[in-house]
Amino acid sequence: MKMNKQDLMDMHAIQALTDADMQKVNQTILAQINSDVPMVNQLGFYIVQGGGKRIRPLIAVLAARALGYESDKVATCATFVEFIHTASLLHDDVVDESDMRRGRATANSAFGNAASVLVGDFIYTRAFQLVAQLQSLDILRIMADATNVLAEGEVQQLMNVTDPDTTEESYMRVIYSKTARLFEVAAQSVAIVSGAEKSIETAFQEYGRYLGTAFQLVDDVLDYSANAAALGKNVGDDLAEGKPTLPLLHAMRHGNPQQAALIREAIEQGGKRDAIDEVLAIMAEHKSLDYAMDRAKQEAKKAVDAIALLPESEYKKALISLAYLSVDRTY
């Protein structure tokens, strides 16, 4: 399906197309976050009702509809993937000592580190309970592998923090592990549960991988280019945390010796925001944000190409549109 930009759906159109399915997913999320332990309920509801994009469940819903597949298992797939993502955010915010996400206090800021870690553990294990309901060893395998890879990505990112010698390859590996792999699972699990051919499963796996990579690249650009209200977190958090993301690595690699030294020091120090204006100026001079955005657009195009074999439908059109929308956003 060759589409011009004016033919693409906007997010409102995609949401309208999937409204009934996403309502079912949200109902499943709320039902499955429930616990007899009050703190689990309180913190769990706080995090799942925190205004997230729900893009992983959306991918699962669109993939199922593109295959003409209808089943309660779709909501189960969408929910277990969202739970893995949600649990990882709870743990992430503790590790990063973050105090703001999606425009409000993080769970660790509101409830404390111990509660956030433990409820994150609960949500992880609830995800595995949901997978067990699907009675599919293939889905269990990809979910277990993805969770393991995600954990490795967290550790790799921790190793990269305050390390200005982090390579672009290492950075991209973290993106795949922490973000793209779960996007893969969102689409691939639906293909498996629907009984689709292996070629379709592979196509959705690749779509998720490339879309997830594009999505995270844009997130890392927005950390330096958005405003805090739109972004839902503090601008420049990555620099303050000493995270060497692609825009920063590009600026350091292409800057003159003085500029490179300034960025190296900013990464090594971490936790300081006083260098942000100088770093932004260096990025602007060397078009580092443009470089990262170009990489994101390449990944989005790969995502679109990956699902070329799907039959034409409004849902395929929505999947294509979602790939391009992932790089054309301000939050």
Regions found by a protein language model. Name each.
Residues 1-331:
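All-alpha prenyltransferase/terpene-synthase fold signal
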